[in-house]
Amino acid sequence: MSQEWKEYAKRVLDEWQPKTKLGMLVKEGQITDIHEIFRKGYQIKEPEIIDVLLPEVNARENQEILDIALTVRMTDSGRRVRFRVLAAVGNRDGYVGLGIGHGREVGIAIRKAINYAKLNIIEIKRGCGSWECRCRRPHSVPFTVEGKEGSVRVKLIPGPRGLGLVIGDVGKKILRLAGIQDVWSQTLGETRTTVNFAKAVFNALYNTNKVVVTPEMIERYGIVVGRAMPASFTLE
């Protein structure tokens, strides 16, 4: 964590009045590593938790607006127009979140989407599962995973170093925020539906956590959970 983001986390910590048990644990310094939250199965309900433990997701390059749509709903008083925004955030090193926000103004909808993405942040497994590579570096997925949303199916397949991201643009943005650099993919369904495609990619990344790995697999594929190089979370 750079000094700039440590200072940002300190400011959030000083001004923040937590409303949940997890928030209090973070505020009191009893939890100082985001990995501990996922290891213990806590649910994140306050975006400030991410602002303190993973402040670098607030950098402009670590936030992506994936889709902006105008929705119209008929009410007794007439047509009601609102914006719907799909956003993703990540630290480019094992953590990524996806969120949808609504609002009468696009700026409000964007802020809501980013906050929801923070609340939905997940920790993923990375590694080198490609038989063409075997470098044991966390540049790809360690094994094939599949995600589904609506009619869309996305399969992420380990790729060798230097391959890049062989997937649609929305998928590329999410994978980069997660810290995935090389991957093959297979897609089925109406992938032009941005929301479903993004959620399917996100679900595939989440499913890396459902595979039970052995010490032999960790050694063979260089599997890491979350950050590849744990940062210092001391805010002193």
UniProtKB/Swiss-Prot annotation:
| Keyword list, A-Z | Ribonucleoprotein, Ribosomal protein, RNA-binding, rRNA-binding
Q: Does the keyword Ribosomal protein apply?
A: yes
Q: Name one GO molecular function term.
A: structural constituent of ribosome
Gene Ontology CC annotations of this record = cytosolic small ribosomal subunit
Outline the extent of the S5 DRBM domain: 61-124
Domain of life, per the record?
Archaea
Instruction: Return the Gene3D superfamilies for the record.
Output: 3.30.160.20, 3.30.230.10
Q: Does the keyword Ligase apply?
A: no
GO terms for biological process, alphabetical: translation
Quaternary structure, from the entry: Part of the 30S ribosomal subunit. Contacts protein S4.
**Would you identify the family this protein belongs to, as annotated?**
Belongs to the universal ribosomal protein uS5 family.
Q: Which HAMAP family match?
A: Ribosomal_uS5_A (MF_01307_A)
Free-text comment on this protein's domains from its UniProt entry: The N-terminal domain interacts with the head of the 30S subunit; the C-terminal domain interacts with the body and contacts protein S4. The interaction surface between S4 and S5 is involved in control of translational fidelity.
The record's function comment reads:
With S4 and S12 plays an important role in translational accuracy.
Quote the protein name from its UniProt record: Small ribosomal subunit protein uS5
The gene behind this protein is rps5
